[in-house]
Amino acid sequence: MKIDIVSVFPEYFEVLNLSLLGKAQSKGLVEVTAHNLRDWTHDVHHSVDDTPVGGGAGMVMKPEVWSECLDELLQLEPAVIENTENIEDSADSFDTGDSCDTTDSDTAQSSAGPENSEKTDIAPSSAGPVLIFPNPSAPLFTQQDATELSHADHLLFGCGRYEGYDARIPQYYRTQGIDVREYSIGDYVLNGGEVAVSVMLEAITRLLPGFMGNAASIVEESYTGDNALLEHRQYTKPAEWRGIKVPDVLLSGNHAKVDRFRRDEALAKTDELRPDLIEALDCTKLDKADRKTLMALGWEVSAAHPRKR
């Protein structure tokens, strides 16, 4: 997988050379390149921002600089649009993404733009690049999005700053046939998109074949799979520590009982902390023991999806 990152602080991404992601790059599984947006400026101050049209606080990242950069990295022919009346206003519809991780404003963060709100089960085409902007006012980045994007051959991340990037940037590249995503990583705002990009990048790349030392370690994680739940608690040795014991069943050696205990704990934990995930479960995929546990937790499981009594 090829990954390009555009930022005014490319040094931030030196951390990607550490740990498993660093090893994945050494093995050739991932190629990560961080670019300085200012390299595409032409003025003495290397300016990448300007005042907001219509007034307001802060500065907005300029489309001219971004377009020169993205045209080159996406290998597109530079174009100048003299009349944009035929381009539909993308502010009316988002594609994917939602929280707030970007810059000081709602656009710099980490979510998908207006055209990202419609989630899809279809993985991005492996042939074409996917352009991703963090944006706190976009749809929320989820494990499902990470799974879909892990099938892409080329990801290009753009990190916003200040009050964010000009809204016409993602709008224009969608009209050029580029798969553009805007995502948020949570309901909060950061100083820039770098942190959000790092979060998404790690969530995506760890799903690549050969990335994890033990592929089975990601199978039962929180939010993973069709009927996603929060993961059960984990323990290691010693069996008793400072008066707190590991649950006896985990020491029994009975794998079936261990599996059932962990499954029941995952259901109970999800019921307490994320009941919305229980509501999304497909009851036809629940076994008899799952149904019994959910009913004991106060859920009705006779319909297509569980419903709290």
Residue ranges of model-derived segments:
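Hydrophobic/aromatic beta-strand patches that form the interior of the parallel beta-sheet core
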Residues: D4-V6, T33-H35, I132, L155-F157, ...
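SAM-dependent methyltransferases
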Residues: T84, D89, D98, L229, ...
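N-terminal nucleotide/polyanion-binding subdomain common to many enzyme families
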Residues: M1-L76, A256-D271, D276-L277
